[in-house]
Swiss-Prot record:
Belongs to the TRAFAC class TrmE-Era-EngA-EngB-Septin-like GTPase superfamily. EngB GTPase family. Mg(2+) binds at residues 39, 61. GO terms for biological process: division septum assembly. Transmembrane segments: none annotated. It holds the Pfam family MMR_HSR1. Keywords: Cell cycle, Cell division, GTP-binding, Magnesium, Metal-binding, Nucleotide-binding, Septation. GTP binds at residues 32-39, 59-63, 77-80, 144-147, 178-180. This is Probable GTP-binding protein EngB. It comes from Methylococcus capsulatus (strain ATCC 33009 / NCIMB 11132 / Bath). InterPro entries: G_ENGB_dom, GTP-bd, GTP-bd_ribosome_bio_YsxC, P-loop_NTPase. One of its GO terms (cellular component) is cytosol. The gene is engB. PROSITE patterns: G_ENGB (PS51706).
Length: 210
């Protein structure tokens, strides 16, 4: 699938689910460890630099960030997990909002999980995968920073990840290689996003933000 002609814009950021946009239409949530390249991946897929904040401090993104494709379709940047050094009360509110979002958000169509290809399947990655399996939420894993490995090593990592995901027994789990630096894997990613968001497939010569 070619990159669809969508224009992605920032919508809002929340700490509590009650402040989220109306639970209508469809959403895809991006999740991952704080240094897995999540924000960079969103910017690459949107073809808009700086759309999602890229911080040099892992865990700086503490809120759930919503981006609008159109009135009925959204991308959601979930807080990165793993390194966040924030006050306890804020951290508790953050975790509660994240859990509530995954549990109750009716418009959620799938989770796009970003994992560093060199350090995949951390403990928190496993928690997210198990949560999706338990809730029957579609999951697509993007092994980021694939440019850091040789092609052979990257393909082996993908095969190992595919085998590991198969162990969860979900037909809606998939995996790919991705590199924001090389912009590789974008069409494969949009194939998944387009299916989940029910994007039209015609007239797809333009790129997002064009």
């Amino acid at each position: 699938m070619k990159i669809p002609p969508v224009s992605i814009r920032y919508l809002r950021s929340i700490l509590e689910l009650k402040d989220a946009p109306p639970d209508q239409g469809c959403e895809v949530a991006f999740a991952g460890r704080s240094n897995a390249g999540k924000s960079s991946a969103i910017n690459t897929l949107a073809n808009v630099g700086g759309l999602a904040r890229v911080s040099k401090t892992p865990g700086r993104t503490r809120m759930i960030n919503f981006f609008s494709i159109d009135d009925g379709r959204r991308l959601v940047d979930l807080p990165g997990y793993g390194y966040a050094k924030v006050p306890g009360e804020i951290h508790r509110r953050w975790e509660a909002a994240l859990e509530q979002y995954l549990r109750y958000r009716q418009s959620l169509r799938g989770v796009f999980l970003l994992m560093d290809v060199r350090h995949p399947f951390t403990e928190m990655d496993e928690v997210m995968i198990e949560w999706c399996a338990h809730r029957s939420i579609a999951l697509h894993v993007a092994l980021t920073k694939s440019d850091k490995l040789s092609r052979g090593a990257a393909m082996n990592a993908r095969l190992m990840a595919k085998t590991r995901l198969a162990g969860y027994g979900s037909p809606d789990f998939s995996v790919q290689l991705f590199s924001s630096l090389k912009k590789s894997g974008t069409e494969e990613a949009w194939e998944v996003l387009g299916r989940w968001l029910d994007l039209p497939r015609e007239d797809q010569e333009k790129t997002p933000g064009a």
